[in-house]
Amino acid sequence: MDDQPVVAAVDGSPDGLRALEWALDAARRYGATLRVLHVRPEPPRTRQEPQGAGPPGADEDPVLAQARARVDELGGIPSVEYVVTEGVPGALLPETGTAARLLVLGSRGRGGFASLLLGSNSLAAARDAACPVVVVPRPDRGGGEEEPVHRDGPVAVGTSAESPDTATLEFAFTEASLRRAGLRVVTAYPWPLQTMLLPGEVAPAQVDQEAMEHETRALAEGLLAPWRERHPQVPVEVVVLPGDAAGHLVGESRDASLVVVGRHRRRLFAPARMMGSVTQAVLLHAHSPVAVVPPARAEQ
């Protein structure tokens, strides 16, 4: 069995139960322990309350009791742990990533404004955790009727043809392999090209869009060669499109079982951990679960 657990963060909300179900499936795929975690917001202490008083144990926690009932109902997982702790969820949840294979959360919990598409705890975990974080959206995220969940759909991954994120690609290929699903590798190129000219400069020759697409595809096919060699059983389709990468990935999410995106590498004078605009947009608007993968240590 895998030494690193798949962690499901629950809080008693329907979003948390959806995350629990997704995490249970993931634990089965990886042959890993499922750790069900409830981070209780720390209540204010009263004068009469003993200083050493802590949260109820896992056996007494009502949120974990609800989760345990759901796990027992679904079954099929050999090893499950239930953990309760107290503190600030937005700070404690990312810390669990140091010893986890995967951290899974719902897009919204019980706190905050119901109209928000992504909760602050989910955003903090996706931005700061050391392991991949999967955010499971609400089925009615589109604002209308509940959308079907494509559990058997392909895995979609966004990557740059010029500077690929190795950790993101490895995660996507592994997920596709374990699911026995196809992998759609989405890469976008800038179009139309924006050219800024200073006074006296001559405009460059017109760039042909077909040539730009051909060059981008050739780069993408080249960078994927090592992963195709390691995962020959995964059918791969390279999707090269102009313009908005986030919009294309959100479009892919309608039929995908999972969309995989990378978190930004560390940059000079920037926060140690950050997310780019594409990753944030996909988290906010995707119809399928989204995996946010931190960069490999060598790339940070």
Q: Predicted segment positions?
A:
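Structural beta-alpha unit
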Residues: 1-2, 15, 72-103, 110, ...
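General small-molecule cofactor/ligand-binding pocket signal
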Residues: 35-37, 81-85, 134, 184-186, ...
